[in-house]
């Protein structure tokens, strides 16, 4: 299941984007999570740890998409980010935070879905070889061939890998483990 997170402070625009993504459910297993506030998104991202694609509105009242992206990059420097906005004036800023693409509103379904599907294809290839889990510093990602073994004691998971030993709270079945 791919997790796509959207953040736009306009409920109407959020509904349009979610509607476009609903079309993907016929082809791919996607979970769509939406936020109307960047601060709420950051709070949940710190707790839950990851998503496969992040779609951010550039201009939001509480915290703009670029600010949200900067904070996300401190937690996860690999998550693909799509920026959507009504103006192209800040396109360069979007690319400074490593945005994959910049899409101008009103968002055309075909353009948006094309970008999302390209990212999902990339993520699917990555998933075959990466194990990710939440950590204090954000999301930790390890190559599966670097993992020696996993241990579970109630809800505490211990990962012993080439890079070191890591622990997180959860269950192995809820994580994307091995292909």
Positions of PLM-derived features:
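Non-catalytic signal-transmission and effector/linker regions of two-component phosphorelay proteins
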Residues: 1-5
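Conserved Asp/Asn-Gly motif in the active-site loop of CheY-like receiver
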Residues: 32-40
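Conserved binding/recognition cores within well-folded domains
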Residues: 114-179
């Amino acid at each position: 299941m791919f997790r796509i997170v959207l953040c736009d402070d306009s409920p109407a625009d959020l509904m349009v984007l979610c509607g476009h993504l609903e079309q993907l459910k016929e082809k791919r297993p996607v979970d769509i999570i939406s936020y109307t506030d960047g601060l709420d998104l950051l709070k949940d991202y710190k707790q839950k740890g990851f998503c496969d694609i992040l779609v951010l509105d550039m201009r939001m009242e509480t915290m703009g998409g670029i600010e949200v992206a900067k904070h996300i990059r401190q937690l996860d420097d690999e998550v693909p980010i799509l920026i959507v906005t009504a103006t192209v004036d800040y396109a360069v800023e979007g690319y400074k935070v490593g945005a994959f693409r910049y899409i101008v509103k009103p968002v055309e379904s075909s353009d948006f879905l094309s970008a999302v599907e390209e990212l999902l294809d990339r993520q699917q290839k990555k998933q075959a070889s990466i194990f990710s889990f939440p950590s204090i510093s954000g999301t930790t990602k390890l190559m599966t061939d670097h993992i020696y073994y996993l241990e579970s004691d109630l809800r505490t998971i211990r990962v012993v890998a080439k890079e070191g030993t890591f622990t997180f709270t959860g269950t192995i079945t809820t994580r994307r483990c091995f292909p």
